[in-house]
Design a protein with these regions (language model features):
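Sec-dependent N-terminal signal peptides
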Residues: 6-9, 300
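Hydrophobic h-region of N-terminal signal peptides that target proteins for export
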Residues: 10-18
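Active-site mouth of glycoside hydrolases
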Residues: 22-238, 246-249, 253-254
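Aromatic- and carboxylate-lined catalytic core of secreted/periplasmic carbohydrate-active enzymes
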Residues: 44, 267-271, 278-281, 294-432, ...
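Catalytic-core region of carbohydrate-active enzymes that cleave or remodel glycosidic bonds
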Residues: 221-325
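Short strand-edge motifs at loop-to-beta-strand transitions and within beta-strands
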Residues: 439-441
């Protein structure tokens, strides 16, 4: 009997652990009152930390999908962006296709067949078990551009998707898919409104072409809840012959500027970089002999964007986003690209994004603003410092270990406690207590390579961090959020 009681207790604990602490336990996702962030219905903040798993539905089997999603959760990701279909029809690893009767889904569920959409259901449900939202890019933009989806078919497809997934707790809808919004806009409008007419539970956005923000075309659209931009994969000066260039020359890596350009459109909505440069992908994408983006590059993109005001960030990896494995060709590289998606999970950038999420959730969330007035004598490009702050804390990201001349009077308190956080490890080092005035700080790196990080200054009357604290808590700031008007 005693053994039975112990076994039953363990079973209850296992079930409870599996069922507890899911993000949607806080309610549905919504836009914050100040229109700049995402939150849950109960008022808790949602910091978007996305992973790019474009070909997950097509290339991974059930066991692989589970391992991948488990790895994402362990690394702190709470969103995985996928291409729901990348062909008309699309085929998955089991040889099943997405469209067995065109855009008529009446007989899509075939008895005794583990179909394409059954596998998609499995992925959505497995993600839910790990507390992850699936960012469903409904159809890739190139297919719409090629005329594979008409306005009427978009209504059918949107109705099918909405009815199938409206009651799943972990769906975020994406229109677009690497495409400008003025290409077949009537199709995107039809697809989006068809879904929104049925599904009242989930938020929606649009994934644009590189170097664009969705606000350029959809700022007034009734269906879009928040914006995304794609800062893209080019280095400074890598224009690559484009005639119509939507950004100033030599600003390709300045993804922080897209936050400002998005907020020039009204009404203001939350925004994030849904596709920055991917770790280990050739700069500019198409030349396998080019240099590749490293972990410190993807960290820079993440901190620059978020400190500029983004409501989160999406990371990507060349091998993972393609789900590369033996038997599949690479789209961005050459025959010498032998790194698999599961090897990519071990790369440093994939595992370092979680420290940004921990940092942003360690302080009162909704009062945070971008504030470059904190910084004096700032530089450009890689030497540019970027600052964000609340009422009683400020954060300054430093990519190049430059001197930081900072105005500590921008936040409350006669004295400020100051820490340095190493972006690659999340390690904290207490630097001391300082008077509230303009002070020049310099963090001395321990190595010759890039050792980027964040200077953290907090009103000494506040206890968001402890002086002897060496890592940030994954639980974040748990106190009730302050009234924005106080």
């Amino acid at each position: 009997m005693k053994k039975l009681v112990i076994l039953m207790s363990l079973l209850v604990l296992t079930i409870s652990a599996g069922a507890a602490n899911k993000p949607w336990d806080n309610g549905k996702l919504k836009v914050s009152d100040n229109q700049r962030y995402l939150q849950f219905e109960n008022g808790q903040p949602f910091f978007w930390l996305g992973e790019t798993g474009w070909l997950l539905p097509e290339r991974l089997d059930r066991a692989e999908a589970e391992w991948y999603l488990q790895s994402c959760a362990k690394a702190g990701y709470n969103v995985v962006q996928v291409q729901t279909i990348d062909g008309v029809p699309a085929y998955n690893i089991y040889g099943q296709m997405s469209n067995i009767d065109g855009w008529n889904f009446k007989n899509i569920n075939q008895k005794g067949v583990y179909g394409y959409w059954d596998h998609m259901d499995y992925i959505v449900d497995m993600a839910a078990q790990h507390g992850i939202y699936i960012g469903m890019v409904c159809i890739w933009g190139g297919l719409v551009k090629a005329g594979k989806l008409s306005v009427e078919d978009a209504k059918k497809y949107g109705t099918f998707l909405a009815n199938r997934y409206k009651n799943k707790p972990n769906i975020i809808w994406f229109m677009g898919g690497d495409i400008q919004g003025d290409i077949k806009p009537e199709v995107w409008e039809s697809l989006a409104t068809s879904i929104k007419a049925i599904d009242k539970n989930h938020i929606m956005t649009y994934h644009p072409r590189g170097r664009y923000t969705s606000a350029k075309w959809w700022s007034k659209a009734s269906w879009i809840d928040f914006h995304t931009f794609q800062s893209g994969h080019r280095r400074y000066g890598q224009r690559m012959g484009n005639k119509d260039y939507p950004i100033p020359d030599n600003t390709e890596e300045d993804n922080w500027m897209y936050v400002d350009s998005t907020w020039k459109f009204n009404p203001i909505k939350p925004v994030l970089d849904a596709e920055p440069s991917y770790e280990d992908i050739p700069m500019g994408l198409h030349d396998a002999n080019e240099l590749r983006w490293k972990d410190y590059d993807v960290r820079r993109y993440a901190y620059w964007s978020v400190f500029a005001g983004s409501c989160g960030h999406t990371y990507g990896h060349n091998a993972i986003m393609q789900m590369l494995k033996p038997g599949y060709p690479t789209s961005y590289g050459d025959a010498g690209d032998v790194k698999t998606w599961y090897q990519g999970l071990k790369d440093p950038g994939f595992n370092q994004m979680q420290y940004l999420k921990r940092l942003m959730l360690s302080f009162p969330y909704f009062e945070r603003v971008a504030d470059q007035s904190v910084i004096q004598d700032n530089g450009e490009k890689y030497n540019r410092l970027i600052a964000t702050r609340g009422n009683d804390y400020l954060l300054v990201y430093n990519y190049n270990n430059n001197n930081m001349k900072l105005d500590l009077t921008k936040i409350s308190g006669a004295k400020k406690n100051v820490w340095w956080m190493t972006a690659a490890t999340g390690q904290l080092k207490y630097l001391g207590e300082f008077d509230s005035k303009v002070i020049t700080f310099r963090y001395h790196p321990q190595t010759s390579r890039v050792e980027d990080g964040v200077l953290i200054a907090i009103d000494s009357n506040k206890d968001y961090l402890k002086k002897d604290q060496t890592v940030l808590s994954p639980d974040g700031y748990k106190a009730k959020e302050r009234d924005l008007n106080e």
